Design a protein with these regions (language model features):
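Conserved metal-phosphate-binding beta-hairpin within the catalytic cores
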Residues: 101, 182-202
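A short glycine-rich, hydrophobically flanked beta-strand micro-motif that places a catalytic Asp/Glu
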Residues: 74-83, 175-191
Length: 228
C-alpha cells in the first residue's frame, strides 16, 4: 500500500495511506535536554537505540486491552518489523489537548497545590486537561472553558473524562500485577467524523509516572521491566 509523508514529529512520523487511514512510524529519537532523556521536554535531545520499538510494543499491548474493554481508540494494527502502527483518521480538539489522570499527588499537581495536600497522597482518579502549547507551558483548561471556546462540547468532555478514568484503571491494574504502582498518566484524544471521542497517539512508558517499592522508575527502565 502506498503511503505519503504528511507530518514529521519529534518521536513519530505520520504517513497517509490509500485506504484513508494513517501510519505512525515510531522513531528512536527521544525528547530530552543536554543528552538526558526527559519526556517532559519539548525538543529531541537524544537518540536511544530501540526506544521506538519498545514504545510501539507497549502501545500495542495497551491499545488491544483498551479496545477489548469496548473503549474507542484509533488503533487498527501494527507491524513490529518496521516499527509502524496503522490508525484510524481523527481530528484533534482545537490545536491539541493533553489529558492527565492522577492517582497520586506528585509532579506539577503538588507544585500547584502542595499547601493543601501531601506529596504522594492518594487522589480519586483526578482528571485535568491542558492545551498543547509549548510557548505557554501547556496551560490548564477547564470543561467550561473548552465548551465556551468551542473546542469541544460538554458531552464530549464528559465522555473523554469517563474514558480517561477507565483506561487509567486498566493500565494501573496491569502494572499492579507486575508489582508496580501507577501515579499518573497522560493521554491524547481526537474525534471521528461523527464527533465520537477516541484515544489517539500512543500509550508508552514516557507518558506515565510509575513507582516500584516506593522508588520512581524512569521510562526506559520501566519498558525493560514491563517486557522482562
Amino acid at each position: 500500500m502506498e503511503k505519503k509523508l504528511v507530518y514529521t514529529g519529534k518521536t513519530k512520523d505520520v504517513f497517509a495511506l490509500e485506504n484513508g487511514n494513517y501510519l505512525l512510524k515510531f522513531k528512536d529519537d527521544c525528547t530530552g535536554k543536554d543528552g538526558v532523556f526527559d519526556p517532559g521536554e519539548n525538543s529531541v535531545g537524544l537518540t536511544i537505540d530501540g526506544v521506538g520499538d519498545v514504545n510501539l510494543r507497549m502501545s500495542i499491548y495497551f491499545f488491544e486491552k483498551v479496545n477489548a474493554a469496548g473503549i474507542r481508540t484509533h488503533f487498527v494494527n501494527a507491524n513490529l518489523e518496521d516499527t509502524t502502527m496503522e490508525v484510524l483518521p481523527a481530528k484533534v480538539f482545537g490545536q491539541g489537548l493533553e489529558v492527565i489522570c492522577r492517582h497520586k499527588a506528585v509532579g506539577s499537581f503538588i507544585r500547584r497545590y502542595g499547601q493543601y495536600i501531601e506529596s504522594g497522597a492518594d487522589l480519586p482518579a483526578y482528571v485535568e486537561t491542558t492545551f498543547k502549547n509549548d510557548a505557554l507551558g501547556d496551560p490548564l483548561v477547564t470543561k467550561d472553558a473548552l465548551a465556551a471556546l468551542g473546542v469541544m462540547t460538554e458531552e464530549q468532555y464528559d465522555s473523554m473524562k469517563d474514558m480517561t478514568q477507565k483506561i487509567t484503571q486498566i493500565i494501573a491494574d496491569d502494572l499492579k500485577e507486575k508489582g508496580m504502582v501507577l501515579y499518573d498518566i497522560k493521554f491524547e484524544y481526537g474525534y471521528d467524523a461523527d464527533g465520537n471521542v477516541m484515544l489517539i497517539d500512543e500509550i508508552a512508558s514516557g507518558n506515565m509516572r510509575v513507582y516500584k517499592d516506593g522508588e520512581y522508575i524512569d521510562p526506559m527502565t520501566l519498558s525493560k521491566l514491563f517486557f522482562a
